[in-house]
Amino acid sequence: MRPIPSLVALILSATLAHAAEKSLFNGKDLTGWKGQPEFWSVKDGAITGQTTAAVPAKENTFLIWQDGEPADFELTCKFKLTDADGKSDGFGNSGIQYRSKVVKPEYSVVAGYQADMECGKTYCGILYEEKGRGILAQRGQKVVIKEGNKIEVTGEVGKSDAIQAAIKPADWNVYKIVAKGGHLQQFINGLQTVDVTDESSVGAKKGVIALQLHAGAPMTVQFKDFVLKTD
């Protein structure tokens, strides 16, 4: 009996989709990642970045994924951010870099798009460009970026307060980033936080993925369950 064509197509499609998925973290060690060893480790099955009073970061530093520079992709992971007391009342600042470039390899520093996160109630979910144009979209905004860093707010994808209410402080949350051409979308716990179309010539079309550990007061950030889907 010959296979039904539609069934063959379905199996092939599923195989290709599976082949395009990649786990970026083995849950055991930092194989495939590179950063400053005094800050990064694996604890309780999660990538852990930590600064302390005894070992502060002199500037923002990053853990950089070593296996490519994705262009169009969907990236999901879980993150947890806490202050020095293991809560969310104090300082805590991190982010997921994408389509970024290494600018200071000796201290693992990158520049580029950042899906931002913090312990506070304002910036978690915004699109920021590290060492570049700064804030590109506030939480809840739909924007188009023109030449000369002209940012046009064209609509909204949600209310900032509602997005914040869905974020679990000092607990695990899910970040999703979707990048296709100049269209960038970010989601936290299923809620879209920004929708950005970068039409400028400086908008990166591909680059490294990295995790930020922000300079400042002691804090801890953890990441796990990375899945990268590419076209």
Model regions and ranges:
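Carbohydrate-interacting regions of secretory-pathway proteins
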Residues: 18-231
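Bacterial N-terminal signal peptides that target proteins for export
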Residues: 1-8
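Hydrophobic h-region of N-terminal signal peptides that target proteins for export
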Residues: 10-19
